[in-house]
Amino acid sequence: FYMTIFLIAEVTAVSLLMNYISGTDLWITSLIIISTSLGYTLYGGLRASIYTDNIQFLAMIILLSVAFYYIIYSGSENYSFEFVNKINPNLLSTGYLPNITAGLTFFIAVAATNLFHQGNWQRVYAAKSSKILKKSLFISFLIIIPIVFFMGFTGLVAISENQEVIPDLAFFYILLKEQVLIISILIIILAISLTVSSIDTLINAISSLIIVDGNSIFKSKGNYFKYSKYIIIILSLIAFIVSSKGFSILYLFLLADLLCCSAVLTVFFSFYKKSINQSNASLSIIIGLFFGLMFFPSPDFSKSILIGFLLPSDIFPEFLSQSLLFSSFFLATFAPLLAWKINKMI
């Protein structure tokens, strides 16, 4: 489920970007991206995906280098923390509670969801040796820190310059606001290559799950390799239809994050705690998902099922009503502990 949402969000992201730059209809970009990815991934499999990862990394470095150069040498005084602090001082305040809860929220979400990303585990087991794997992870760790910092900085600048900026396109808003043709063309090429490479990883990941789990779960021994291709095509059609609607990418990810948060402790602790059986694991995940959904915010982040819908918001502490997403993810992650306690009592 998470990887299907991820697939939809990836296609939606590049479709929105193309629409933002050139006005291209969402469905046209979605069709091109999905068709291209399926065309070589269903044939080349994991080898093709790993090969395109090299292209993806190169494209990412070029894109970030162009962005960094553009910001540094643009001459604008807006690209500084002083500007952000002047316009929106709360964004840089360590005493502003939403800053802390937002950071914790996305830490929980990213940690939980990536543990369920089969594409990551495929890369782990495809490594030639443990030594190479450790070296790769360490280098990736060093690379990703400045990238996340830079992307976060551009987001702060974008929202400070324009309160109406689309959050999903904040980074590209910075690069495209001057409407420089060569930069627009470069972004289109690099963004498409990045998206296609990410999508092929997801397609391979979903396909491998169908093959492995199909053989282990179902008693009938069918050709799950063949079945996986059919299922991938069906999921791609769903991704095409949904991405053509242009729904919020962030909200799609958050829905998938919620499910992963509700399952992460149960799934991984069950590897070590023999007391967590199948029925107890299912109950734990359901409890986590229930509590998470009760606090999961609406698309405008103003209310949730419990706060603002079933019960008025003013009877709850202000902390809860202002931190619905954090409360949702926190409860979804740790509420399954209740099921473990109940199981011990029984």
Regions found by a protein language model. Give the residues of each.
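Membrane-embedded helix-loop-helix hairpins and adjacent transmembrane boundary segments
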Residues: 1-346
